[in-house]
């Protein structure tokens, strides 16, 4: 997900996206802990997507 795509969304949509990503991160961490996660790169991808969403939310809050 690109930051440019996120900037076109409203704050409510970004909040929903953030909640969705946090749930996905939790599920991936649980799968990793139980040894069921083969694609460990997804953890890094989701973590960075969360950071992008939070950054855009903070930018919108400052406007």
From Swiss-Prot:
The keyword 4Fe-4S does not apply. The keyword Zinc-finger does not apply. Signal peptide: none annotated. GO terms for molecular function: structural constituent of ribosome. CDD domains: Ribosomal_L29_HIP. Transmembrane segments: none annotated. Keywords: Ribonucleoprotein, Ribosomal protein. InterPro entries: Ribosomal_protein_uL29, Ribosomal_uL29, Ribosomal_uL29_sf. GO terms for biological process: translation. One of its GO terms (cellular component) is cytosolic large ribosomal subunit. Belongs to the universal ribosomal protein uL29 family. This is Large ribosomal subunit protein uL29.
């Amino acid at each position: 997900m690109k930051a440019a795509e996120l900037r076109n969304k409203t704050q409510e949509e970004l909040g929903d996206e953030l909640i969705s990503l946090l749930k996905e991160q939790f599920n991936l961490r649980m799968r990793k802990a139980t040894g069921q996660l083969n694609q460990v790169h997804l953890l890094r991808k989701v973590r960075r997507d969360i950071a992008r969403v939070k950054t855009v939310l903070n930018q919108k809050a400052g406007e």
